[in-house]
């Protein structure tokens, strides 16, 4: 018996016998919501999270908080964007997300809990066979989204009038470090910006602390901004 215990005892010293099972894929809801509400997607049995973006002076510029059901549906989502003076707070109610304060129906849902329509803006979303949002459209614009085999968002292309804005992301080849990525932004096929992010990860392969470098190449000379992202995540 003691010989059978040796491998496990060795593993305890090295990595631990009872390791957290890592989920490498992203759910359709998490990936799609991260595209629309501009936050880093998370993996695994997330119960609630807060993602905070801070500038070089340590000032908060953006914060996204969410609570999720065990099935992976967003029960609530709150976005505070100080740079654009935007506040959004949504709560799930059957087939809609309501404004958390006025209780006005804001977003209609499809399927289990996926985005379908934003009536006030005339925006509708389309999904693929796996439930990922791949298109958004209104009278003024059309957007297409791309994902890799694990559901990680690879970018989007937005067409409006005579302008085409494309963002293409390249994640790390290490599947554990998906949120280590570079991205390039093109406007009418002309490069106007790039992004690089590197993170530290928890046992669920989710980012805890990240450095985000954004370079605006649309101005001369180019302007570089450095941000810090901090995540607090609770799991089921």
Swiss-Prot record:
It is found in: Cell membrane. One of its GO terms (cellular component) is plasma membrane. Its main location: membrane. InterPro entries: UPF0257. A lipid is attached at residue 17 (S-diacylglycerol cysteine). A lipid is attached at residue 17 (N-palmitoyl cysteine). Residues 1-16 form the signal peptide. Keywords: Cell membrane, Lipoprotein, Membrane, Palmitate, Signal. It is a lipid-anchor. Belongs to the UPF0257 family. This is UPF0257 lipoprotein YnfC. It comes from Escherichia coli (strain 55989 / EAEC). The lineage of its organism: Bacteria, Pseudomonadati, Pseudomonadota, Gammaproteobacteria, Enterobacterales. The gene is ynfC.
